[in-house]
Amino acid sequence: MSKVVVLNDKLEKAGELDLPSKYAEVNPHNLYLYVKSYLASLRANTAHTKGRSDVSGGGKKPWRQKGRGGARAGSTRTNVWVGGAVAFGPTNERNYFQKVNKKQKRLALERALADKAAKGVLFTADSLAIESGKTKDANAVIKKLGVKDALIVKDLLDEKTLLAYRNLANCYVVDVTEVNAYLVSVFNAVIMEKSVLESITKEG
């Protein structure tokens, strides 16, 4: 059974919660498909090369077909010539979008959470707000839990908490609308507010 570590107000371990057993039964291929789709959506699609129809010049045959003793050539803009076209090169017309439906997104998130819970690095607390807005207080949270890096998921993201975590290279803070299977997967630990966890498990 996948367990969620429950933290008290002092961010000390106070107990455990069970994730729905079906989370661990989700086919990991759903997680793979979502991560693949997510990373594809980040591609800028700026690489572009010119094909035979794009390069200028080359309309005239450079030399006669026979009698010179050399290889025949019909244009100076084929891909074997300097200044010629590129064969099978990337173009900015390519669309990298990969469709993933809502059900697969939900299943991917469930599997990602189950994996973290199985490793004992899925935490939940009533509140994760940093009222001081200071980075040292945010860093103290991570040190206290003894994790390398963490994804912080709040129900409503306030400005002070965002400022507190923003300067930490090993942390990323989002609200419940932004959490996804990719973010859960790439961080060593995930810390959620209880309301967020309840919202996610209720949807599942």
From Swiss-Prot:
InterPro entries: Ribosomal_uL4, Ribosomal_uL4-like, Ribosomal_uL4_dom_sf. SUPFAM superfamilies: Ribosomal protein L4 (SSF52166). Keywords: Ribonucleoprotein, Ribosomal protein, RNA-binding, rRNA-binding. GO terms for cellular component: ribonucleoprotein complex; ribosome. Residues 49-75 are annotated as: Disordered. GO terms for molecular function: rRNA binding; structural constituent of ribosome. One of its GO terms (biological process) is translation. Disulfide bonds: none annotated. Part of the 50S ribosomal subunit. One of the primary rRNA binding proteins, this protein initially binds near the 5'-end of the 23S rRNA. It is important during the early stages of 50S assembly. It makes multiple contacts with different domains of the 23S rRNA in the assembled 50S subunit and ribosome. Forms part of the polypeptide exit tunnel. Belongs to the universal ribosomal protein uL4 family. NCBIfam families: rplD_bact. PANTHER family: 50S RIBOSOMAL PROTEIN L4, LARGE RIBOSOMAL SUBUNIT PROTEIN UL4M. This is Large ribosomal subunit protein uL4. It comes from Campylobacter jejuni subsp. jejuni serotype O:2 (strain ATCC 700819 / NCTC 11168).
